[in-house]
UniProtKB/Swiss-Prot annotation:
Tissue expression from the record: Expressed by the venom gland.
Function per UniProt: Short linear cationic amphipathic alpha-helical antimicrobial peptide (AMP) with potent activity against both Gram-positive and Gram-negative bacteria, moderate activity against the yeasts C.albicans, S.cerevisiae, C.glabrata, C.krusei, and C.tropicalis, and low activity against the yeasts C.dubliniensis and C.parapsilosis. Minimum inhibitory concentrations (MIC) have been tested on B.subtilis (MIC=1.0 uM), S.aureus (MIC=11.1 uM), E.coli (MIC=2.6 uM), P.aeruginosa (MIC=15.8 uM), and the yeast C.albicans (MIC=6.6 uM).
Family classification: Belongs to the lasioglossin-like family.
Record's description of how this protein is used: The synthetic analog S5T (with the Ser-5 replaced by a Thr) is a possible anti-leishmanial therapeutic candidate against both cutaneous and visceral leishmaniasis. In vitro, this analog shows significant anti-leishmanial activity towards two life forms of the dimorphic parasite, the free-swimming infective metacyclic promastigotes and the intracellular amastigotes responsible for the systemic infection.
Lysine amide: residues bearing it: K12
GO CC term, one of those recorded: membrane
Location of this chain's protein in the cell: Secreted; Target cell membrane
GO biological process: defense response to bacterium; defense response to fungus; innate immune response; killing of cells of another organism
Keywords from the named record: Amidation, Antibiotic, Antimicrobial, Fungicide, Immunity, Innate immunity, Membrane, Secreted, Target cell membrane, Target membrane
Note: Many analogs have been synthesized to study the effect on cationicity, hydrophobicity, alpha-helicity, amphipathicity, antibacterial, antifungal and hemolytic activities. A decrease of hemolytic activity is accompanied by undesirable decrease of antimicrobial potency.
Name used for this protein in its record: Halictine-2
Length: 12
C-alpha cells in the first residue's frame, strides 16, 4: 500500500 504512494511520487 505504501509503495503506491511512493511510486506515484516518483512517476509524477
Amino acid at each position: 500500500g505504501k509503495w503506491m504512494s511512493l511510486l506515484k511520487h516518483i512517476l509524477k
